[in-house]
């Protein structure tokens, strides 16, 4: 689609364009047209049933993502995180949110996910939650796969998706739908400004 993308991550295994901690980063206003942030989700996850949660650490990362968005003031921004405790943190209050089940976009598991986003992205969107027509449920109406690293006590007998990259991935169909809407927003903005639409700069922040 003609996008120039810059990836940011603290983990070298993902080979990001910028290897850094987002809490130590600053960008100038207008640096990126679009920002997609996926702050780490493990300690926000409702699937975490062992060990203490380090919410101060995870909050500091999520807040850094929001700070960068405020600094850059991109035309479009999205903060992605599996539905869990992040939606209840005080600093997320008031942000527009779109909630989707990944199984409705072709994923082999439900993985209900919150997408916090700029007002222009949220316009016209309704939550897309599983209605049992996703093709991933058994005869009892339960999802056959669980997106977590280990068996689910809540769903005995369900298969689990243990590979890290698989658990972190966003369904391609959902990505395409989001990109189409972003293209429309960028094109409309370009027409209003008298500029030639197309292309753009995108930033991605750490995996969640």
Model regions and ranges:
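Accessible peptide chain termini
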Residues: 1, 207-208
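Residues lining the SAM
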Residues: 38
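Adenosine-cofactor binding site in Rossmann-like domains, unifying the SAM/SAH pocket
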Residues: 1-29, 34, 92-99
């Amino acid at each position: 689609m003609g996008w120039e993308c810059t990836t940011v991550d603290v983990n070298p295994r993902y080979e990001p364009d910028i290897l850094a901690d987002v809490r130590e980063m600053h960008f100038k206003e207008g640096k990126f047209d679009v920002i997609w942030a996926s702050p780490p989700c493990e300690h926000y996850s409702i699937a975490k049933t062992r060990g203490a949660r380090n919410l101060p650490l995870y909050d500091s990362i999520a807040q850094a993502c929001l700070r960068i968005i405020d600094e850059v003031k991109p035309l479009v921004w999205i903060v992605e995180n599996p539905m869990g405790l992040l939606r209840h943190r005080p600093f997320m209050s008031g942000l527009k949110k779109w909630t989707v089940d990944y199984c409705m976009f072709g994923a082999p598991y439900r993985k209900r996910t919150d997408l916090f986003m700029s007002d222009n992205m949220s316009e016209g969107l309704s939550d897309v939650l599983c209605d049992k027509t996703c093709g991933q449920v058994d005869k009892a109406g339960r999802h056959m796969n669980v997106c977590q690293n280990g068996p689910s006590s809540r769903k005995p007998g369900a298969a689990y998706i243990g590979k890290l990259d698989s658990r972190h991935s966003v369904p391609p169909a959902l990505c395409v739908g989001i990109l189409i809407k972003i293209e429309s927003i960028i094109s409309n903005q370009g027409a209003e400004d008298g500029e030639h639409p197309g292309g753009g700069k995108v930033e991605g922040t750490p995996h969640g």
